[in-house]
Curated annotation (Swiss-Prot):
Family: Belongs to the NodA family.
Top-level EC class as recorded in UniProt: transferase
Originating gene: nodA
EC number assigned by the record: 2.3.1.-
Name this protein carries in UniProt: Nodulation protein A
Keyword hit for NADP: no
Keywords: Acyltransferase, Cytoplasm, Nodulation, Transferase
Signal peptide: none
Keyword Protein biosynthesis applies: no
Function description: N-acyltransferase required for nodulation. Acts in the production of a small, heat-stable compound (Nod) that stimulates mitosis in various plant protoplasts.
Length: 196
């Protein structure tokens, strides 16, 4: 896949309306096959589900968008430690390209992550994606952090729901400016905002 995909690395404010329309369609198809609820945030040309990324890596091939990864710098709290991270989210691969590995996405943005000055990349996926993340971590680029729940705010206010939720998700961390040994211990990560 890597040799057939060309990457567009861009800041959020560099995207044009046509980019958002194409990305929205990509997310509707990519997330929608796992349930209409997951696709709903992307209706109407929207290209983010919770927090809006500040940077995107968009992979294109002869058939259009092949893959996408969003990045957002933010402070999270791991246990009692405030920590700057680059959160990775809005990850998607076109269904016909799945199973070819996700490590290519991180390797494409690794130089940018170094320039951002973040000590770690942080990401979460639902439990159903465990096999994909384990494959990615086997390459040594990241580690799964077990025994941790993540608290996030909801992206929108709902009068019948609390403003935050705590989830048992797969947490993965990739060291960028520090070693993995320096990741703080704790059983709760406060995202202090909506997920990416």
């Amino acid at each position: 896949m890597g040799s057939d995909v060309r990457w567009k690395l861009c800041w959020e404010n560099e995207l044009q309306l046509a980019d958002h329309v194409e990305l929205s369609d990509f997310f509707l198809k990519t997330y929608g096959r796992h349930g209409a609820f997951l696709a709903k945030p992307f209706e109407g040309g929207r290209t983010w589900a919770g927090a809006r990324p500040e940077f995107r890596a968009i992979g294109y091939d002869a058939h259009g968008i092949a893959a996408h990864i969003g990045i957002l710098r933010r402070f999270i709290k791991v246990g009692e430690v405030d920590l700057l991270v680059a959160e990775i989210g809005l990850y998607g691969v076109r269904p016909d390209l799945e199973g070819l590995g996700i490590s290519f996405s991180l390797s494409v943005v690794y130089p940018l992550l170094q320039r951002m000055g973040v000590p770690f990349v942080f990401g979460t996926v639902r439990q159903a994606m465990r096999n994909h993340v384990e494959r990615f971590c086997r390459g040594g680029l990241a580690s799964i952090v077990s025994g941790v729940e993540v608290r996030s705010t909801l992206a929108n206010i709902h009068p019948d729901l609390p403003p935050t939720r705590v989830e048992d998700v797969i947490v993965f961390v990739a060291p960028i400016g520090r070693s993995m040994d320096e990741w703080p211990s704790g059983t709760l990560i406060d995202r202090n905002g909506p997920e990416l």
